[in-house]
Every structure is written in structure tokens, then in C-alpha cells.
Amino acid sequence: DGKRSDIVTVAWTGTICTNPPMLYISLRPSRYSYDIIKKSREFVINLTNEKLAKTADECGVKSGRDIDKWKVMKIEQLPSKVVAAPSVKESPVCIECKVENILELGSHHMFIAKVVAVNVDGKYMDEKNKFDLTKADMVVYNHGEYIGLSKVLGTFGYSVKKKKTRK
């Protein structure tokens, strides 16, 4: 709302459209950040790496009603390019979003949003200007565990690629 911001750890998120680029987050209405996002109609998804995993966990178990997470956890704010909501400076990728729709689904409400800007820390880009997951040490949350994603297992289509034959 321009006056307050919070950091909330979100387990339910994902891409829902490529063109236009859209994604979603799902939050319980009881969460402190819920009303902030509902009123401002914007948010930033700050992707988490191994360096931020403990901070992300702490942001998920402590409420912004009780503490200013930015100050207590010494997280540096980075002004976003398009939205008023700040980005996390330490995050390798910050995705700025504007809410298009809110679906009240039950325990969680889904914020469907258009991506309006993406900010990537240049040190994680490869020589082809592609984001390098193996350099960024990205983390996902799965059923109570934080799991590192620094290993490439294959490329698109590798399961059906024909093996080269020697002549």
C-alpha cells in the first residue's frame, strides 16, 4: 500500500502463461501479507538460493504483524523497476508482478498476476546471457524441506533424442 511492505515465504507459486507472462501465488487470507497484496495489487517474487534459505524459512515462520522482517533479518531492500513493492537485493532473480485477478479457492486465495519486470543479478548469467541455475545455487521448498537445484540432469528432448552413430 506504499506505507508498509513485508516478506512472506510462499510455497504455492508457478507459471500460468507464457504470453503474456503470468504467474500466481496462493496465500491464506490470515497471512499478514495477504491484505497488503490485495490492497496494493502488486508483489515481487524473490527467488531463493542456498544463501537465502535460512532467511526464507525465518520469513515463513515469523509474522510481519509482530516484527519488521527487513530490519530484524537484515535483508536489504532494492527498489523495484515498475512496482512500488521492494525487491530483496540478495535474491538472484526478482520478478515484479501486478495482480490481475484473485480467486478465492478455499484455504488459499490465488493471486493471478502479470509479470511486469524481471531483474536478474548479472553474476548468474552465462556467456550466452542465459540464467545459469548451477551458478545460482537455487532452492525449492517441497513438503517441509529446502532442496538445492544445482545439478543439470538433461536438456529439453533428451529423452527422445537419437543417439549418434559412428560411420
Residue ranges and their predicted role:
Residues 1-167:
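Basic, polyanion-binding surface patches
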